[in-house]
C-alpha cells in the first residue's frame, strides 16, 4: 500500500513538469524558443508543429531566429508566425525569419502574471485530485481490512507531506515566473 504514496509522488512530479512547460509558453521580456511551441505550420498541406519544420535560435535577447529546414517553405512558416498571437512581426533575413519581441507594457505584464497564476492553480488542482484519489484508496484499504488504522494514518501523513512539498514547489515556480514577467 506504500506503493500508493510512491505512485502519487510520481503523478505529482508529472503535474509539476506540466506546469513548468505551461510557464515556458508564457511570454516574458526575453525571447524564448518555447514561445513558439504552440505554432503549427501548413507544411506540404499537413498541419505540422513549427519545431518539426525549422530550427529556432535566439541571436539576441529579444529576437528569435526561425530557419526552415526546407527554404521553399519559408513563406508558410512566415505566415504561421504572422497569424500567431505573439504580437511580433516576422521579417525575412535571407533564409531565416527574425521575430523581434516587442517590449511588454505594464498591462500586458499583469495579464501574463494572471495567466501564470491560472496555470499554477491548474497544477495545484491536479495535485489535490491526485491526493484525493490516493486518500480514497488508503481509506478503502483500511475499511476492507487490508491494513491497520495505524498504517493508514502513517500513509496519509506521508501523502500529506508529499502534497505539501509539491504545492510549495508550484508556489516557488509561480513566484519565480512572476518575478521574471515583471522584470523590466
Swiss-Prot record:
GO terms for biological process: translational termination. It comes from the Bacteria. It is found in: Cytoplasm. Disulfide bonds: none annotated. SUPFAM superfamilies: Ribosome recycling factor, RRF. One of its GO terms (molecular function) is ribosomal large subunit binding. Keywords: Cytoplasm, Protein biosynthesis. GO terms for cellular component: cytoplasm. Belongs to the RRF family. Responsible for the release of ribosomes from messenger RNA at the termination of protein biosynthesis. May increase the efficiency of translation by recycling ribosomes from one round of translation to another. NCBIfam families: frr (TIGR00496). This is Ribosome-recycling factor.
Amino acid at each position: 500500500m506504500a506503493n500508493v504514496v510512491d505512485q502519487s509522488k510520481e503523478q505529482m512530479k508529472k503535474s509539476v513538469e506540466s506546469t513548468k512547460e505551461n510557464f515556458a509558453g508564457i511570454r516574458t521580456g526575453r525571447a524564448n524558443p518555447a514561445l513558439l511551441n504552440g505554432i503549427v505550420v501548413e507544411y506540404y498541406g499537413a498541419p505540422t508543429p513549427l519545431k518539426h519544420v525549422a530550427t529556432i535560435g535566439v541571436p539576441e535577447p529579444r529576437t528569435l531566429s526561425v530557419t526552415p529546414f526546407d527554404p521553399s517553405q519559408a513563406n508558410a512558416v512566415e505566415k504561421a508566425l504572422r497569424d500567431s498571437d505573439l504580437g511580433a512581426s516576422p521579417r525575412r533575413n535571407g533564409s531565416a525569419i527574425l521575430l523581434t519581441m516587442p517590449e511588454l507594457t505594464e498591462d500586458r505584464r499583469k495579464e501574463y502574471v494572471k495567466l501564470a497564476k491560472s496555470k499554477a492553480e491548474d497544477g495545484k488542482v491536479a495535485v489535490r485530485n491526485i491526493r484525493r484519489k490516493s486518500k480514497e484508496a488508503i481509506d478503502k484499504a483500511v475499511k476492507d481490512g487490508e491494513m491497520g488504522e495505524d498504517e493508514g494514518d502513517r500513509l496519509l501523513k506521508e501523502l500529506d507531506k508529499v502534497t505539501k512539498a509539491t504545492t510549495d514547489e508550484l508556489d516557488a515556480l509561480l513566484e519565480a515566473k512572476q518575478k521574471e514577467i515583471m522584470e523590466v
